[in-house]
Every structure is written in C-alpha cells, then in structure tokens.
Amino acid sequence: MSIRPLHDRVIVKRKEVETKSAGGIVLTGSAATKSTRGEIIAVGKGRILENGTVQPLDVKVGDIVIFNDGYGVKSEKIDNEEVLIMSESDILAIVEA
C-alpha cells in the first residue's frame, strides 16, 4: 500500500532507540522510551497560504528529523509497519550529517 500525505503533512518512520542503559542493562516497557527521531518517507505538496499559493515544505524524503511526539502526531500501520503522520510544524529539526 502507498500513502500520500496532504498539504503540509509528512509521513515519518520512527528510528529505533537504544534499548540498553549506559551500564549495559536492557530496558523494557516504560523504561525504554520511544525515539523522537525518524526518517521522512513521504511529504505533502505544501502549506496553502491565505492568498491561495502553496508554500513548499522545508523537509524532503530521506531527511532524518527530530520531532515533537505530541498531540498532533497520528500513528498508523501501513504494510505492518508503524508510521507517523504529522504536520511539518511538529518537526523541530533536520539532522545533518
């Protein structure tokens, strides 16, 4: 299945988080926090401004981002993989190598 976000929304695949503590203890359950980093796998066409023009997004497919995992972020399963649907405004930063 393919998914195409609308307007200023993006689809993010969450990056796996390290599940061991600094001391080598394996973290499980609530002790293992979910990562707030992910890879952009799809982007919408952009935000529609009041004058009707479309402002393109600053992020692109393949970007690694840090995002706010809050109220506006929707989790969905696509082809048995969890993806996150969010607005570009939920993205805090692009990780540059």
Curated annotation (Swiss-Prot):
PROSITE patterns: CHAPERONINS_CPN10 (PS00681). Keywords: Chaperone, Cytoplasm. Together with the chaperonin GroEL, plays an essential role in assisting protein folding. The GroEL-GroES system forms a nano-cage that allows encapsulation of the non-native substrate proteins and provides a physical environment optimized to promote and accelerate protein folding. GroES binds to the apical surface of the GroEL ring, thereby capping the opening of the GroEL channel. InterPro entries: Chaperonin_GroES, Chaperonin_GroES_sf, Chaprnonin_Cpn10_CS, GroES-like_sf. It comes from Enterobacter sp. (strain 638). It is found in: Cytoplasm. SMART domains: Cpn10 (SM00883). One of its GO terms (cellular component) is cytoplasm. Heptamer of 7 subunits arranged in a ring. Interacts with the chaperonin GroEL. It holds the Pfam family Cpn10. This is Co-chaperonin GroES. Coiled coil: none annotated. Transmembrane segments: none annotated. PANTHER family: 10 KDA HEAT SHOCK PROTEIN (PTHR10772), CO-CHAPERONIN GROES (PTHR10772:SF58). Belongs to the GroES chaperonin family. GO terms for biological process: chaperone cofactor-dependent protein refolding. GO terms for molecular function: ATP binding; metal ion binding; protein folding chaperone; protein-folding chaperone binding; unfolded protein binding.
